[in-house]
Amino acid sequence: MSLSALENTINTAFDARDTISAATKGEVRDAVDQALDLLDRGEARVAERDASGTWTVNQWLKKAVLLSFRLNDMHTIAGGPGGATWWDKVPSKFEGWGESRFREAGFRAVPGAIVRRSAFIAKNAVLMPSFVNLGAYVDEATMVDTWSTVGSCAQIGKRVHISGGVGIGGVLEPLQAGPVIIEDDCFIGARSEVAEGVIVRRGAVLAMGVFLGASTKIVDRETGEVFIGEVPEYAVLVPGALPGKPLKNGTPGPSTACAVIVKRVDERTRSKTSINELLRD
């Protein structure tokens, strides 16, 4: 089925989603399965960047991911600790893989790394014990460090370092219009959180513990400019706070969390955040 036919079939099915179940057969199931396979192989992406830097969301692919939950029944998944099983609708990306398939894929997945089917992992990526949800895209030479999560349909660029315990939000619940996007050469510090469709532009650095959502103010302390929903290229962010409005009784109100751009990336920053090629051999 062509991409345009896939898109039309999935859009129509999504509008009639209340009629779809695990018993549904035929064109709709075939279209969703094909769309998920394209995502899994990296031949289609939920969001794509054009030459001008504008990201376009392929909403029909996101709809395909959502429809798969209606189409697929629960089943046991082997591999739990102590011979236990899990109970879910989405199989592992690695189900049925052997040595040759991993060598062909060209990335590292250490014990404890969980990737759900329809997520794409590019060559030379490194997955420590982490979780990559369905529909996500993790590009070449990116490190997803221990206990980090890459949410549904999130788009992670090349040579990105996602430090330990980072949360990259998904789009499925609560339902978001667009995925979180981390562009090439970014560094996301430990225990940071990027959610609600925020875009982190190329080369930006988030210090440890930066929390960004759709309404978080990002304040450039040099210029006073305020950004919302997007981190500028090569910005270095740290956690901050804005003074709150006085309360009705005149006492100072609580401050509001924000992120602060303290500088742009320089050579000193690069030396601290550059990736280690030895880990990707």
Swiss-Prot record:
Pfam families: Hexapep_2, THDPS_N_2. Keywords: Acyltransferase, Amino-acid biosynthesis, Cytoplasm, Diaminopimelate biosynthesis, Lysine biosynthesis, Repeat, Transferase. The keyword Cell inner membrane does not apply. Pathway: Amino-acid biosynthesis; L-lysine biosynthesis via DAP pathway; LL-2,6-diaminopimelate from (S)-tetrahydrodipicolinate (succinylase route): step 1/3. GO terms for cellular component: cytoplasm. Its EC number is 2.3.1.117. Its main location: cytoplasm. One of its GO terms (molecular function) is nucleotidyltransferase activity. Substrate binds at R108, D145. GO terms for biological process: diaminopimelate biosynthetic process; lysine biosynthetic process via diaminopimelate. SUPFAM superfamilies: Trimeric LpxA-like enzymes (SSF51161). It catalyses: (S)-2,3,4,5-tetrahydrodipicolinate + succinyl-CoA + H2O = (S)-2-succinylamino-6-oxoheptanedioate + CoA. It is found in: Cytoplasm. Homotrimer. Belongs to the transferase hexapeptide repeat family. This is 2,3,4,5-tetrahydropyridine-2,6-dicarboxylate N-succinyltransferase. The gene is dapD.
